[in-house]
């Protein structure tokens, strides 16, 4: 991946990107393949995945119009580019709204490291540095295609972001099979669906592929001999690299279909490992596929294939279990059918029809817009002509009839004819009657108004008289009240001072004041005594309350001390038990380690034929019918009559 960077920038990359230079292309592809598997598993379980620095894989719900006023609600996967990356490089992406009930999990490097031979730091460094290199490639205005294995291809061309998903992935996520058809039939989303064959196509040299995958195994693999039928003669031919890639692609399509069926048969929560296709590709001997195809790719029904006899099947060695003679002949007579070319032709035809439909639709829309503009233009012309005609008519009318006065003054008005004299007399009588009735009505209204004024004056006079009478009455009552009060004061007036007698020994004032002082002093003494008793009781109660509080505090301190001692004892007991459990676990682990060491030593000293798979080499069986490889068609079931050797009986 770093082969396109200049030498000056490579030294800087070794400081900024310490992980990528130490990894090969195959290792980088393997790491991103594991990342794609993790994202695919999470999307299969209807969960979003956020890749820091790149974007988020999630779902969106959309109502698609299927025609004939029918709508279908689909949930399709989408990729939302990171906002920081979009703002930094000025990228353009369709705005997509994702519902909030779909959980989004971050990229878990620990789970990815458990699935491959790389540790967590290596995977995280590879992902981060690859995204840094991707950001630099975008910054220099270079076209980029980022391939996610099993998911789709993220392409950035002319600062436009587009994510195209594989049909197999959409089918596995949807489960109903309607999502792919709905997206492929709509003009807005038809370019979001990508077939698996298009992903293997040759990319333009101007686009930078992430992560780069070099097919070294395909280039270094020797040509495979394929036996086919050509002109009725049996002869082997060597397939070229292009034919071999087509066959591998056909096998890929069949395997992907099997993967789709297997994935639909299980629930999303149980998918915890890689797909069946990845397991099939990682297997050493199972990855080689022998295909028997005719040179022309077609077979006639009346022609029988002619194959060269082989003593044993050399391409199906699985744990020593070869194919028997019968299964081998059946396998050689069968030929594989690949629908890759037909599927590609069908897709090309569908794309052509879709383009024709789009062109026809655009032409129809353009024709409708032209017709609408022409109709609008004609209507505007009609309105302008009508307005012009109205203006001309108004102008001509004004010119024909100029303004004139509506009334005239005649100096000598001629007399009215005698025919209208009777009507004029009636009109004059009616006018006189109206004038008389109007005059009577005014007189009556004036009389009523005067009467109402007089009534108001009389009523006001009565109210004033009543108020004055009430005022006089209240004044008389107040005078009587003051008079009674003065009479009571005069009546209750105290006695006069005693007469002064000179040289009198008896006191004149304060003769009866001693008894009152004695009573007052007694009251004060009793009050003071009561107050002293209350103060003493209050002081005694305060002292008792203080003693009770001190005793309660002392009891609380003693209880707290006992609880603290009990907690310390329990903590010491817990620590002792924990130490004892740890010591027991250590002893148990030590014993298990010793046992494992003994088992490993015994295994190393054991013979090579210890496992059942090693012993299966002695007993070769056909992998299809489970019979011995020397089977030539005989049956294990005895017939109704069988001749026994050395006997005259027929059983």
Swiss-Prot record:
GO CC terms in record: centrosome; ciliary basal body; cytoplasm; microtubule organizing center; plasma membrane
Regions of compositional bias (Polar residues) in chain numbering: 265-275
Basic and acidic residues composition bias: residue spans: 212-222, 232-250
Residues forming coiled coils: 428-465, 539-566
Location in or out of the cell: Cytoplasm, Cytoskeleton, Microtubule organizing center, Centrosome
Phosphoserine sites (modified residues): 206, 273, 275, 294, 416
Region Disordered: start-end pairs: 194-314
GO molecular function, one term: DNA binding
One Pfam family matching this protein: HU-CCDC81_euk_1
Keywords from the named record: Coiled coil, Cytoplasm, Cytoskeleton, Phosphoprotein
Stated name of the protein: Coiled-coil domain-containing protein 81
Organism: Rattus norvegicus (Rat)
Lineage: Eukaryota, Metazoa, Chordata, Craniata, Vertebrata
Name of the coding gene: Ccdc81
């Amino acid at each position: 991946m770093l082969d396109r960077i200049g030498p000056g920038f490579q030294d800087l990359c070794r400081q900024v990107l310490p992980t990528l230079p130490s990894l090969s292309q195959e290792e980088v592809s393997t790491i991103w393949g594991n990342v794609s598997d993790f994202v695919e598993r999470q999307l299969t379980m209807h969960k979003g995945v956020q890749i820091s620095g790149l974007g988020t894989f999630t779902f969106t719900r959309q109502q698609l119009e299927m025609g004939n006023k029918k709508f279908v609600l689909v949930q399709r996967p989408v990729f939302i580019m990171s906002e920081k990356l979009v703002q930094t490089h000025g990228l353009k992406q369709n705005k997509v709204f994702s519902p909030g009930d779909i959980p989004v999990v971050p990229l878990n490097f620990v789970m990815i490291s458990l699935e491959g031979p790389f540790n967590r730091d290596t995977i995280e460094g590879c992902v981060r540095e690859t995204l840094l290199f991707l950001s630099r490639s975008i910054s220099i205005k270079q076209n980029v295609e980022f391939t996610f294995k099993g998911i789709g291809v993220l392409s950035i061309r002319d600062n436009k972001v587009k994510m195209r998903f594989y049909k197999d992935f959409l089918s596995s996520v949807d489960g109903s099979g309607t999502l792919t058809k709905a997206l492929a039939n709509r003009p807005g989303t038809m370019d979001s669906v990508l077939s698996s064959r298009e992903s293997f196509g040759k990319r333009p040299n101007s686009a930078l592929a992430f992560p780069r995958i070099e097919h070294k195994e395909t280039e270094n693999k020797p040509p495979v001999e394929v036996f086919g039928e050509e002109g009725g003669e049996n002869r082997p031919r060597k397939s070229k690299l292009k034919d071999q890639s087509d066959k591998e692609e056909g096998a890929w399509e069949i395997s992907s279909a099997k993967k789709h069926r297997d994935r639909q048969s299980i629930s999303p929560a149980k998918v915890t490992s890689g797909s069946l296709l990845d397991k099939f590709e990682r297997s050493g001997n199972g990855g080689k596929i022998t295909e028997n195809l005719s040179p022309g790719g077609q077979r006639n029904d009346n022609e029988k294939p002619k194959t060269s006899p082989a003593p044993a099947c050399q391409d199906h060695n699985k744990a020593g279990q070869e194919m028997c003679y019968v299964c081998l002949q059946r396998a050689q007579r069968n030929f594989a059918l690949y629908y890759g070319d037909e599927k590609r032709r069908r897709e090309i035809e569908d794309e052509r029809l879709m383009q024709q439909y789009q062109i026809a639709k655009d032409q129809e829309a353009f024709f409708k817009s032209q017709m609408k503009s022409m109709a609008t233009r004609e209507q505007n012309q009609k309105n302008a002509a009508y307005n012009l005609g109205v203006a001309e008519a108004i102008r001509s009318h004004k010119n024909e009839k100029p303004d004139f006065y509506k009334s005239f003054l005649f100096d000598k008005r001629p007399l009215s004819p005698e025919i209208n004299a009777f009507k004029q007399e009636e009109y004059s009588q009616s006018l006189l009657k109206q004038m008389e009735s109007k005059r009577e009505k005014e007189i009556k209204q004036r009389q009523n108004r005067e009467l109402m004024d007089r009534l108001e004056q009389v009523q006001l006079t009565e109210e004033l008289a009543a108020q004055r009478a009430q005022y006089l009455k209240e004044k008389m009552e107040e005078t009587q009240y003051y008079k009674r009060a003065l009479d009571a004061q005069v009546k209750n007036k105290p006695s006069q001072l005693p007469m002064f007698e000179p040289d009198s020994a008896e006191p004149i004032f304060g003769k009866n004041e001693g008894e009152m002082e004695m009573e007052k002093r007694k009251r004060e003494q009793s009050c003071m005594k009561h107050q002293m008793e209350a103060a003493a009781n209050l002081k005694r109660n305060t002292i008792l309350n203080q003693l009770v509080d001190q005793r309660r505090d002392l009891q609380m301190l003693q209880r707290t001390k006992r609880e603290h001692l009990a907690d310390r004892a329990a903590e010491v007991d817990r620590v002792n038990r924990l130490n004892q459990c740890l010591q027991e676990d250590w002893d148990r682990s030590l014993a298990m380690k010793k046992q494992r060491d003994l088992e490993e030593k015994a295994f190393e000293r054991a013979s090579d034929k210890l496992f059942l798979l090693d012993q299966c080499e002695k007993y070769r069986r056909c992998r299809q019918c489970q019979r011995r490889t020397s089977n030539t068609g005989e049956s294990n079931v005895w017939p109704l009559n069988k001749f026994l050797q050395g006997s005259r009986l027929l059983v």
